[in-house]
Amino acid sequence: MNTILAQQIANEGGVEAWMIAQQHKSLLRFLTCGSVDDGKSTLIGRLLHDTLQIYEDQLSSLHNDSKRHGTQGEKLDLALLVDGLQAEREQGITIDVAYRYFSTEKRKFIIADTPGHEQYTRNMATGASTCDLAILLIDARKGVLDQTRRHSFISTLLGVKHLVVAINKMDLVDYCEETFARIREDYLTFAEQLPGDLDIRFVPLSALEGDNVAAQSANMRWYSGPTLLEVLETVDIQRAVDRQPMRFPVQYVNRPNLDFRGYAGTLASGSVKVGERIKVLPSGVESSVARIVTFDGDKEEACAGEAITLVLNDDIDISRGDLLLAANETLAPARHAAIDVVWMAEQPLAPGQSYDVKLAGKKTRARIEAIRYQIDINNLTQRDVESLPLNGIGLVEMTFDEPLALDIYQQNPVTGGLIFIDRLSNVTVGAGMVRELDERGATPPVEYSAFELELNALVRRHFPHWDARDLLGDKHGAA
């Protein structure tokens, strides 16, 4: 066991008390990105090493692996802690997205180490989709490169609001303050084209030597700011989903016996309480929450991010892919939308093509109507194209086979994000983020027969405890 971990457990009074303390720590998900060979994997290895998160057997294996695959001579090659694929070690690059977990006294962390090579940009987008913060590494010798711009744009496109620009390999430029200042100015000039609500910070460091990673550097006394670890421990993450209206995509209908019917899923945004009136989309049927069931027992209220099962007071038709929201919320299903797309397939995306799309638990078919433009990553300008190539990013107009309950991605990533699936190979070929909604072709108002209206009025008059909805409620309100 890691001796530091053993000491922490002892200080907390045992394993159970230590685990409870861990559960109450805040969690930060972040990714490392940047151009190839900027030192992303080495930086993560340094963080794990300097925060004493490496076990004795891992350290022993690292010594052996450094001799066989290392690129740092007699020094430990810390990148080998995260470059686990054989191809990665042979080529000295990152290919897949590698996830690592560690914690300090202040916070828990999940790290996504993403590839720097352009052909693996799709892997980088996958890693960024769940993160709150991005560390953008820049080689102090090379400055801002195309991949730096590409990864910055993709990160912000996927909703990342906190960017830490880590100017790495300062040891190779003699810890020069002028080099740091020049790269900082270059990046800020580029960042003027990014969304204006970003939190951008700069840290000069050397992942190989450990300068300004977990401890202040004696070689850069001109820098008085926080270390990288201090930034990660103290950054205030405000998740938009906590402030958004309640959205609950149904992932599974749980029916273990005749006495229980629950709707399982993860609460995408907002909160829900027992007794609250809810509405089901696309049907529009209403009910109220009878129970909120979790692994640890029933709750009175659940918040965004919690995995729950909702039990309703009425037996109504709800299937996987339906969306539950507050009864007083208005969300009109749409068949047409403009989608920001990151294309991940060798075959280009072109108008006229059809794909399966998956949104939360909902799966349907969509047709590409037009490509408005492709983004030139070098200068973030828009250009007209006939198709979107591998790793291309652009704005695409789509039509769905059926109306979908969608949100704008920047407001709610779960109900505003989707993936494209090839219908023949079942391979994921693209990621989409809803930019604009067009309600053309949305579900038209329902016309009820005279018999249905009379029956509805009869039920509401004689059985008020059924809470039946007034089918003419909207028209009565207008009158």
Swiss-Prot record:
UniProt lineage: Bacteria, Pseudomonadati, Pseudomonadota, Gammaproteobacteria, Enterobacterales
Family that this chain belongs to: Belongs to the TRAFAC class translation factor GTPase superfamily. Classic translation factor GTPase family. CysN/NodQ subfamily.
Region (G5) location: 206-208
Stretches the record annotates as G2: 92-96
E.C. numbers: 2.7.7.4
NCBIfam families: CysN, PRK05124.1, small_GTP
Name by which UniProt lists this protein: Sulfate adenylyltransferase subunit 1
Gene: cysN
Region entry G4, spans: 168-171
Chain intervals for the UniProt region annotation (G3): 113-116
Single biological process term from Gene Ontology: hydrogen sulfide biosynthetic process
Keywords for this protein: ATP-binding, GTP-binding, Nucleotide-binding, Nucleotidyltransferase, Transferase
Domain called tr-type G: residue spans: 25-239
